[in-house]
Amino acid sequence: MNRGIPFRHLLLVLQLALLPAVTQGKKVVLGKKGDTVELTCNASQKKNTQFHWKNSNQIKILGIQGSFLTKGPSKLSDRADSRKSLWDQGCFSMIIKNLKIEDSDTYICEVENKKEEVELLVFGLTANSDTHLLEGQSLTLTLESPPGSSPSVKCRSPGGKNIQGGRTLSVPQLERQDSGTWTCTVSQDQKTVEFKIDIVVLAFQKASSTVYKKEGEQVEFSFPPAFTLEKLTGSGELWWQAERASSSKSWITFDLKNKEVSVKRVTQDPKLQMGKKLPLHLTLPQALPQYAGSGNLTLALEAKTGKLHQEVNLVVMRATQFQENLTCEVWGPTSPKLTLSLKLENKGTTVSKQAKAVWVLNPEAGMWQCLLSDSGQVLLESNIKVVPTWPTPVQPMALIVLGGVAGLLLFTGLGIFFCVRCRHRRRQAERMSQIKRLLSEKKTCQCPHRFQKTCSPI
């Protein structure tokens, strides 16, 4: 009987030797479609030893034979590899490149009579449409996942917008702050994998802008895009609605090709000038009240449905003095909250109204400021100098001129007077001479009728 004990021990040892390799607990690894993943497998001893990687169908993927890496007939043969430099450290990981959704499987590493199972789940996250979208359009993200999985997805935009869901996520009405890199996290079996998706929202940096100018100043309109593209082709137009006009009209049309701007048509009044390079830039030679109003610039990009829009407003200020009235006026779209003021510099005299015109009757002399303000912040300022209302002193040169004119008039008048007097005297002398002659003729008269009265008939 004592001889039977060692024999039983021998059988037990033999059975243990013939047992299959012990399987370790399964690990879960998440991978991204098109990316590279490394499945780890470590031996207890830091030395080079034999190992094999197989798929769930027990088909060999790769392994070691002597000191060389060998590959089996699997579909991963051209994309699987191992780090030979780490074999001496007991690390026998398998690297899979250019991951595909169908690579999702359970992979088995056999080393030192033990098996390590690694479950690989490959996910893909893509945008259903182009990643270059116009402002206001919708973005849809679709998750590709292996059969049998139930992942959840959470995405965050550059502007802080959060969306979450299952295999489909939708973002309606994209805004310009949504442009940039979106970070999406896919979760499965308490594991996560992160995706980065670049979304470009095609829009101008500002939806609306207002330019404040004094009458006569040059006006600059700028329309910088909120995105950068190597090639940008399209066409655009600026429509303008002047405050004084009954209808809007097209001020300018242009073409855009490879970031070069060419003008197609421009009005003669006003005659805008346009820059030839991006960003889009327009110059109005003078700010006049008849131009104050609102405009809408549209840009239609090639191969895109829809247009980019930016609204621009022009507010014009005028300060005038007419007789005894000082007036400050503005034209163009202004908020009812804006305040228009007339203020005498270095004095407390101020007239303010939430209106488009203010005035002062009989203003004091000095420098007056016309101010358009929003909650104390000055948006536009124009200065006008008021002169005293009393007559200004006559200059010496004016006195000389006036004296000369008066002397000339006096001399002319005296000349005329003496000429008339002299002529009158001459005519009077002639008249007296004529009277004397007539009297002389009367004394010597021997008319026949006189003799008839004094003589008797014979």
UniProtKB/Swiss-Prot annotation:
**Primary location class:** membrane
- The region annotated as signal peptide is 1-25
Q: Which residues are glycosylated?
A: 42, 296, 325
Cytoplasmic-side positions: 419-458
Query: Which Gene3D superfamilies does the annotation name?
Result: Immunoglobulins, transmembrane domain of human cd4
Lipid moiety (S-palmitoyl cysteine) attached at 419, 422
Classification via InterPro entries:
CD4, CD4-extracel, Ig-like_dom, Ig-like_dom_sf, Ig-like_fold, Ig_C2-set, Ig_sub, Ig_sub2
Alphabetized UniProt keyword annotations = Adaptive immunity, Cell membrane, Disulfide bond, Glycoprotein, Immunity, Immunoglobulin domain, Lipoprotein, Membrane, Palmitate, Phosphoprotein, Repeat, Signal, Transmembrane, Transmembrane helix
Region described as Disordered: spans on this chain:
144-167
Chain positions with Phosphoserine modification? 433, 440, 456
- Spans within the Extracellular topological domain: 26-396
Which PANTHER family does the UniProt entry name for this protein? T-CELL SURFACE GLYCOPROTEIN CD4
Name this polypeptide is given: T-cell surface glycoprotein CD4
Species this protein is from: Macaca fascicularis
